């Protein structure tokens, strides 16, 4: 950790000039380290055969399985255009529609799992590879059926997509949440701003602001 790799965020009802001066006073004298280690981003190789890891924890009463499908991460320099926001919108709705299907199966008389969901994000802590990830939680004697159901529903969505009704429902919910965030924009908590700025600093995630997102 060096000063060149750090940032400081101050959020709140503050005197900007006074706080900025105080931050400069506290941190400007920290010297740069001429021999600091270079920050490296290592590639994550693809694999043809599945890599399986099993970990046992006696305190866990249920079994959890995570299935990662790796894919290339969006380069930081491509995250500043409208195409990236459109990509995020599509990814969000795809996962929301698939998760709605998975949740419906929990409501059946004989559910295949206790919980199941999908999301798309970093592959563990890697910055050079993302992963479409499926999570399923089952009783110990139902793990095979739980994993099979998760994979089957994911493949069904990949091959045949979703219905217009599913899309309209997911889109309406997405817009409802966006409108709610816009209407409550003056009540946002400080940590919500901090989270946005941290993601921008570390991963170059855009910060369009709720006003612009709502307008788009």
Annotate each predicted stretch with a short phrase.
Residues 7-62, 172, 176-183:
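An aromatic/glycine/proline-enriched structural segment found at the starts
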Residues 4-11, 61-82, 102-216:
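M16 family metallopeptidases and their MPP-like homologs
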Residues 85-87, 91-95:
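Long, His/Glu/Asp-enriched segments that create or flank divalent metal/ion-associated functional microenvironments
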